[in-house]
Amino acid sequence: MNSKIIFLFLFSIAFSLQIGAQNNHISTPPEVSPMPMKAEMTEIWEPEVSVVTPAKTLGDAPSDAIILFDGTNLDQWVKQKDNAQPAPWKIVDNDHMEVVPGSGGISTKMKFGDCQIHIEFSAPDVVEGSSQGRGNSGLFLQNRYELQILDSYNNRTYRNGQAASIYKDHAPLVNAMRGPLEWNTYDVIYTAPRFKKDGRLDAKARITVLHNGVLVQNNVEISGNTYYIGLHDYPSAHGDDVLSLQDHGKKTQFRNIWVRPL
């Protein structure tokens, strides 16, 4: 009998201690570390965060952006297949540029890696054609990875080839295309691929895209170089490279293009 009483007594003490320990743990505020620290020990002051002045109008370039096209000239662009030649597209009303069908694509003079891009585009003034034949163009990141530009307003095509798709790789989450004669925007956050010293792929490129302010690509991996026929891949290592706009035989229009290297 005495041994049972002693056992029950010891058990009750152990149980009480366990409950007390749990209560003490629960009562510790989650925002206070149990380590003996002061608040300033986790404050980082240097280097001070750089100041960038945002644009007064949404979509305009912030103070640290590189202006690639402001409507007045094509000085930052060259012919895609011969960078010794000037960009062959035309400027309209000192406001926007227009593809000259058959003249070939254009590329930036500067090369980029990780970057933020803003670009505005409009389908041709005359709505004609269907599927891939309506207002087709493309923004090529590092001259390899295509963000599709297409008039996808009431225009059915394959889902991974419509506006805001990573062409034949990722369909957009939604179709956010505006109607005829309206301007569209792409805001892009691009992370370039990484390669090992021996040239092998270490990390694929990634991209986030907002189409007219709507999220359509959410930090997706780019499978590789864009091909019309065949599977995307990374055939060779590369560094920074140009941005290119495609001539697909349609009078697609562009304005207000800027980039922020990241």
Predicted segments with their positions:
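Bacterial N-terminal signal peptides that target proteins for export
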Residues: 1-7
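Carbohydrate-interacting regions of secretory-pathway proteins
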Residues: 22-262
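Bacterial N-terminal signal peptides
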Residues: 8-16
